[in-house]
Amino acid sequence: MKITDHKLSEGIALTFRVPEGNIKHPLIILCHGFCGIRNVLLPCFANAFTEAGFATITFDYRGFGESDGERGRLVPAMQTEDIISVINWAEKQECIDNQRIGLWGTSLGGGHVFSARAQDQRVKCIVSQLAFADGDVLVTGEMNESERASFLSTLNKMAEKKKNTGKEMFVGVTRVLSDNESKVFFEKVKGQYPEMDIKIPFLTVMETLQYKPAESAAKVQCPVLIVIAGQDSVNPPEQGKALYDAVASGTKELYEEADACHYDIYEGAFFERVAAVQTQWFKKHL
């Protein structure tokens, strides 16, 4: 395969993998999760898809990795714009069959793929893994009524302060993504990838709470495969099932790795099985 790096006019850094052969290839754009960068977790899937005959693109959202933008600023609507910017660039590449563009998203990116498809009919096929359906339920679902009211009041006060003063609190990623799985993962990778050791606005919690990928999924008519991990404590499998239920498409499937946790899908036997299932899905529907 041929691997090249590019920087788009919007400031988005991407890596473009193209299989051998002078033909127009179908394309899979891989969309990362919460504060993810393209060199972490994604290459194994990108390489597997490219070896199977698909061109692939991995990229950094603005504000992360090698892309431009305010460091750590995470807004789902902006990240969806980034996906569409990548589609715009990709369809102009001579080696790409621009009638066969698919999206693959993981975790938060597994929600973004529905937001992008709801806005852009050029997307012909979706794979979404380890995603959530409703950010409000994800963030506050285990709180009682008074705890939830107090939590929302605090967020609203912080948002008002930002509006009035322009100042806001920035915290480490694991202050927001505070489950044990994520703490272990981010602690492990930030030593190898210092660009993962960043501060993000605490109000990212509010962005997550207001984000409801199921609403976009209800507008999606293309083929959709949803992958969930049965032991996922970041985005519990019930969230993935709710997302599957919301998908409007008549061509949809739900695949579960019952014994996997959130970060297990990227290596070993879990990865081998999931990548094979996803590759077959793209071969059939893209």
From Swiss-Prot:
Domain of life of the source: Bacteria
Domain AB hydrolase-1: 26-268
InterPro entries named in the record: AB_hydrolase_1, AB_hydrolase_fold, Polyketide_trans_af380
Keyword vocabulary terms for this entry: Plasmid
SUPFAM superfamilies: alpha/beta-Hydrolases (SSF53474)
Disulfide bonds: none
Family: To E.coli YcjY.
Stated name of the protein: Uncharacterized 31.7 kDa protein in traX-finO intergenic region
